[in-house]
């Protein structure tokens, strides 16, 4: 496939071949000369080779570790399961993700009406994934390959790692580990954990070794609980939560509190005769590691298998946007970010951001306008505690509410300087802020930021978070 960027005279977009994407079929695997795969990833989304889509990020990170990786996007679960068989058994493990959204949120409105479209599918068509994707895919893989490890991750698995209220069935459900039969769960952003798992498995599958890694959850027998670190919290059992709403509420508060700590405890939740163990997360990803993740050789395009099948709406929305940071310390009660990305912000370097913008200017169809320079909240770039020792003692869900933390550095000047550097790049006419802005972060010293955004970076209406 060859594409040319016509918006800048003399500037050409990269020419890509099918081999520039991770393989999705046996034909593509054989074209690389591979006779065996190390890891096979299954995703509920279409395969878009872009750093905004989890399967692509994990696949590229594993590829960077020297592993042979393939992705099976949106396999058919209703026929003879040929999509689950076509690539055979991987040498190390299967990885399963529901996609960028929980499959039930993707499928149904708040009134539990079936949606007629799917933003993560070619043509925006619905019906290419089942309800409870992670559980369905994992059960199928365990049925076909009972001896091959299945590792689950992504937003659906992450937010269902312990007992949770399932709005769609109006009931409490146990950990997705119990319902799916998966061997291991990675919660949160997996770009630190997954490569560590791959390294740990180079010498063969050793579940005991994997259970020692941070940011994983697994099912354990009673005798294994006695060997856990002393800094652990025993939650109420799933069975007690079914009988007592107060017990479930207490569990939720404990889990939420630990997710807001810089140094969290191990969580243990009894379910039946086993225990769900949730190890503490890794420290916030470093700038170097975050830059490395964004610098992987993404094509930034949907896989050629979707040519002629219509646009993928989710991709169309973000294809000319740039993510500046990860994490959010807003602490909104309705938001899942603290449970998935955490409240501590990790920012990319200026050069990493500018390098990505340069790549954008060479993409087909780019007309000089960046749709978003943002993140979970638009204006938290390079923000955090001035004194990290104080942050280590803190368990506040929000650094903003009910008032700004006195330890918070809310200086917007680094972000303003980044905006200006982006706008000075050749090929960029204008950059917009499409993410929501937290106006409660403004102080007397940040009025210049609001002026900068309103005058130079608003495409119609200012978006707030």
Question: Model-predicted segments: where are they?
Answer:
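Glycine-rich beta-alpha loop elements in corrinoid/cobalamin-binding modules
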Residues: 46, 54, 73-272, 278-284
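Helix-enriched interaction subdomains in cytosolic or periplasmic regions
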Residues: 1-15, 112
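N-terminal pre-triad scaffold of radical SAM enzymes
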Residues: 42-48, 62, 309-336, 369, ...
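Conserved, mostly hydrophobic/aromatic
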Residues: 183, 293, 328, 332, ...
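N-terminal [4Fe-4S]-dependent radical SAM core
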Residues: 9-36, 46, 250-321
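Iron-sulfur (Fe-S) cluster-binding segments and ferredoxin-like electron-carrier domains
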Residues: 335-352
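Conserved SAM/AdoMet-binding glycine-rich loop
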Residues: 34, 41, 57, 71-72, ...
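Terminal amphipathic helices with adjacent charged low-complexity linkers/tails
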Residues: 78-79, 207-260, 273-275, 281-285, ...
């Amino acid at each position: 496939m060859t594409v040319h960027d016509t918006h800048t005279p003399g500037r050409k977009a990269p020419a890509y071949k099918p081999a520039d994407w991770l393989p999705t079929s046996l034909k593509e695997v054989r074209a690389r000369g591979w006779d065996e795969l190390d890891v096979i990833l299954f995703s509920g989304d279409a395969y878009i080779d872009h750093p905004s889509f989890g399967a692509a990020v994990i696949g590229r990170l594993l590829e960077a570790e020297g592993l042979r990786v393939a992705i099976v996007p949106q396999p058919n679960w209703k026929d003879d399961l040929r999509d689950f068989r076509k690539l055979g058994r991987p040498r190390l493990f299967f990885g399963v993700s529901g996609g960028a959204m929980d499959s039930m949120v993707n499928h149904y409105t708040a009134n539990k009406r079936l949606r007629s479209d799917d933003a993560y599918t070619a043509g925006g068509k619905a019906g290419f994934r089942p309800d409870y994707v992670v559980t369905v895919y994992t059960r199928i893989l365990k049925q076909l390959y009972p001896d091959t490890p299945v590792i689950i991750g992504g937003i659906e698995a992450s937010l269902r790692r312990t007992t949770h209220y399932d709005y769609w069935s109006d009931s409490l459900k146990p950990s997705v580990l119990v319902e799916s039969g998966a061997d291991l769960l990675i919660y949160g952003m997996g770009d630190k954990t997954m490569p560590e798992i791959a390294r740990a498995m180079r010498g063969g599958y050793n579940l005991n070794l994997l259970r020692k890694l941070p940011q994983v959850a697994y099912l354990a027998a009673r005798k294994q609980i006695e060997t856990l670190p002393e800094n652990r919290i025993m939650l109420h059992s799933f069975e007690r939560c079914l009988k007592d709403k107060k017990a479930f509420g207490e569990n939720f508060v404990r889990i939420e509190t630990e997710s807001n700590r810089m140094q969290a405890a191990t969580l243990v939740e009894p379910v039946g005769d086993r225990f769900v163990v949730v190890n503490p997360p890794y420290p916030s990803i470093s700038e170097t590691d975050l830059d490395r993740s964004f610098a992987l050789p993404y094509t930034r395009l949907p896989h050629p298998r979707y040519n002629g099948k219509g646009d993928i709406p989710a991709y169309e929305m973000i294809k000319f946007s740039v993510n500046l940071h990860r994490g959010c310390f807003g602490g909104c009660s309705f938001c899942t970010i603290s449970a998935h990305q955490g409240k501590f912000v990790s920012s990319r370097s200026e050069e990493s951001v500018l390098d990505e913008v340069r790549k954008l200017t060479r993409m087909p169809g780019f007309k000089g306008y960046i749709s978003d320079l943002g993140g979970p909240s638009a204006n938290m770039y390079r923000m955090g505690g001035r004194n990290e020792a104080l942050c280590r003692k803190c368990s506040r869900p929000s650094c903003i509410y009910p008032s700004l933390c006195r330890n918070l550095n809310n200086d917007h000047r680094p972000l303003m300087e980044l905006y200006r550097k982006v706008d000075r790049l050749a090929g960029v006419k204008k950059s917009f802020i499409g993410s929501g802005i937290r106006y409660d972060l403004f102080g007397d010293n940040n009025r210049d930021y609001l002026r900068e955004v309103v005058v130079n970076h608003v495409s119609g209406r200012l978006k707030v978070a």
